[in-house]
Design a protein with these regions (language model features):
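Hydrophobic ligand-binding cavity/cleft-lining segments
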Residues: 1-42
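N-proximal short alpha-helices
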Residues: 1-4, 37, 63, 98-102
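Residues at beta-strand starts and edge strands
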Residues: 2-4, 58, 71, 84, ...
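Glycine-rich portal/gate segments that line the openings of hydrophobic small-molecule binding cavities
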Residues: 10, 29-30, 39-81, 85, ...
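A short, structured loop/turn motif at beta-sheet edges
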Residues: 12-16, 65-70, 89-98
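Generic recognition of short, well-ordered alpha-helical interface segments
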Residues: 13, 30, 59, 120, ...
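Beta-strand/loop substructures that line and gate deep hydrophobic ligand-binding cavities in soluble
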Residues: 78-127, 139
Length: 139
């Protein structure tokens, strides 16, 4: 198993603002520079799916596997002989809202999918979270 996390603590946004932004999957392309298109297939609830088209990559179907409103959601992307999980965690602290994204890859071919997909996602996390904060402030 491979896991990488990135966190930022900020007083610029509330958990309600960041939750509204990040759970509005259909509009990710408006603030996430790595996303060409995204579409929620149904409702934002466990067991539902969304389609994601990263810039320069193929369209993928992603499943919502855990949701705790205003605290956390986790999605799962299935690859041949591997699964990738993206955990989006929001924690109120004395220093502000701590925003953490953790990417995890499991499976027999995880090393291949880490090189092909996960490393690029992790590299973009600092900029992605800054963009989330900037855009959530407008809500």
């Amino acid at each position: 198993m491979w896991t990488k996390s990135y966190s930022v603590t900020t007083k610029e946004v509330t958990k309600e603002q960041i939750w509204k932004l990040t759970t509005d999957i259909d509009h990710w392309k408006n603030w996430d520079e790595t996303v060409e298109d995204s579409k929620l297939l149904g409702e934002f609830k466990v067991g539902e799916y969304f389609m994601l088209k990263p810039k320069g990559g193929p369209k993928v179907k992603i499943k919502l596997v855990e949701i705790i409103p205003f605290k956390k959601f986790t999605d799962q992307t299935s690859f041949p002989l591997a699964k990738m999980y993206g955990e989006h965690f929001y924690e109120e602290t004395e220093d502000g809202l701590k925003i953490t994204v953790t990417m995890t890859m499991k499976g027999l071919l995880s090393k291949i999918w880490i090189k092909l997909v996960a490393n690029d996602i992790v590299k973009s996390l600092p900029e992605d979270i800054i963009n989330q904060i900037k855009n959530a402030k407008k809500l």
